[in-house]
UniProtKB/Swiss-Prot annotation:
<keyword id="KW-0479">Metal-binding</keyword>
<dbReference type="GO" id="GO:0009098">
    <property type="term" value="P:L-leucine biosynthetic process"/>
</dbReference>
<dbReference type="Pfam" id="PF00682">
    <property type="entry name" value="HMGL-like"/>
</dbReference>
<dbReference type="InterPro" id="IPR005671">
    <property type="entry name" value="LeuA_bact_synth"/>
</dbReference>
<comment type="similarity">
    <text>Belongs to the alpha-IPM synthase/homocitrate synthase family. LeuA type 1 subfamily.</text>
</comment>
<feature type="domain" description="Pyruvate carboxyltransferase">
    <location>
        <begin position="5"/>
        <end position="269"/>
    </location>
</feature>
<protein>
    <recommendedName>
        <fullName>2-isopropylmalate synthase</fullName>
        <ecNumber>2.3.3.13</ecNumber>
    </recommendedName>
</protein>
<comment type="function">
    <text>Catalyzes the condensation of the acetyl group of acetyl-CoA with 3-methyl-2-oxobutanoate (2-ketoisovalerate) to form 3-carboxy-3-hydroxy-4-methylpentanoate (2-isopropylmalate).</text>
</comment>
<feature type="binding site">
    <location>
        <position position="204"/>
    </location>
    <ligand>
        <name>Mn(2+)</name>
    </ligand>
</feature>
<dbReference type="InterPro" id="IPR013785">
    <property type="entry name" value="Aldolase_TIM"/>
</dbReference>
<dbReference type="GO" id="GO:0003985">
    <property type="term" value="F:acetyl-CoA C-acetyltransferase activity"/>
</dbReference>
<feature type="region of interest" description="Regulatory domain">
    <location>
        <begin position="393"/>
        <end position="505"/>
    </location>
</feature>
<dbReference type="GO" id="GO:0030145">
    <property type="term" value="F:manganese ion binding"/>
</dbReference>
<feature type="binding site">
    <location>
        <position position="240"/>
    </location>
    <ligand>
        <name>Mn(2+)</name>
    </ligand>
</feature>
<keyword id="KW-0464">Manganese</keyword>
<dbReference type="InterPro" id="IPR054691">
    <property type="entry name" value="LeuA/HCS_post-cat"/>
</dbReference>
<dbReference type="GO" id="GO:0003852">
    <property type="term" value="F:2-isopropylmalate synthase activity"/>
</dbReference>
Amino acid sequence: MPRRIKIFDTTLRDGEQSPGASMSLEQKIKMASALERLGVDRIEAGFPVSSPVQFEAVQRVSATVKKAEVVGLARCVQRDIDAAYDALRDAAHPMLHIFIATSPLHREYKLKKSKEEILDTVRECLNYGGKGFSRMEFSPEDASRTEPDYLVEVVKTAIECGATSINIPDTVGYAVPKEFGQLISFLVEQVPQFSDGSVDLSVHCHNDLGLALANSLAAVRSGASQVEVTLNGIGERAGNCPMEELIMSLDVRKDMFDVETGIHTEYLYPTGKLLQSITGLLIPRNKPIFGDNVFVHESGIHQHGVLNKRETYEIMKPERIGRSSETIIMGRHSGKHALEDKLSQYNIKLTRQQFEDVFARFTAIADKKKEVYDEDLFSIVGTVLGGVVKGFSLLYFHTFTGNSLIPGATVKVRSEAGEKVASATGDGPVDAVFNAIDECVGINARLKEYIIHAIGSGKDAQGEVKLEVEIEGATYGGKASSTDIIEASAMAYLNAVNRFELRKR
């Protein structure tokens, strides 16, 4: 039977320490609920003593979360422990997390304490914490740079004083996988409570050298029973071990790890996107698991392979993490197989000569653009066929807005049925344009996601809009770019509507 690995999420505490990642109380509650749905075992809600806002956040999360353990951080200081106890009073499953640094650098320059003084502090604080908590985690900060024999002494002392979980932090991301794995193996050998499972052995790895995931996986193979993570890898400096990367590494490579977690992987991507929307920290396009490029293929050779058998170039299914399965990006490296597949999605049927003409025109455009959008293909096919491909196209738009005006828009759209003009108001000019388009096309679409980013720099930079809309219970994506972000938004919205219309037919 696979060994069970606990997932300790610290997105709300360590993750929020990432510059620009601060969250409001309501946002923290929303994230905590999403993390609980995801299936994490422990949620570190904050550092209660650090501020009234942190205290209230831990308090509110404690009252919201019912299944996962809610954790409050504290230094080895009695007032910190008291604050954590008060903040966690309403938690169904409260846990105290106490830490103190143990490495020579921290002992000499930060704490100015001897080894024995630190051991005395550990005894005093854990004994005090045990009066209010049945579950306590202890972290010897900077453990990876602490003398191994002294680290064992500190760990054994903490367990004797009531710690039910010991966390080994690579606080500054200094360790490398072989070294960190050996440290975990050494602790398992020296501390019987780790091998018999009566005390959790946790790891908390930072990513300063880009090794947080590798070190965490090395620790799991060496006997760690819990891994501390953040969604999207956010956190101090270079961040923490990304939950999504750890979970899918363990999932995809079961042959190497033979472990299981309680994570419902189909909620990974939606939860990561929720965090992005709350913090505004964009997920890089090439980020493992969550990046936009992970499940898309532009190379003709790769596209041909994926169209025949997805496993040729994909080691996991996007649906496994809650992503859509659209995988082909049309660009300069795309081949005929990919173009045929894209046209078939819209039920566009061509003779062999017409297809060759379309492919030649497509190649010419692809050499000039990073990505060829569906609207470009519609235009090419329309030119070759001598008519308009089924769908809607934007003829013009006009918007007005201001701090004392209700934003509005007028839009003119062309389709097979003719041209139509509509006006609408909205919560800003983009929303007004979308509402006007709905009037023109006669469809009620609900915007689910809207992302914009710059292509290039300076005054000639283009804004690329990527969005998703829900129509009749199904989700359709759209993309477009323009130097005018409202125009790009309108074109992307029509792109999504055209996907619905053309696939419906």
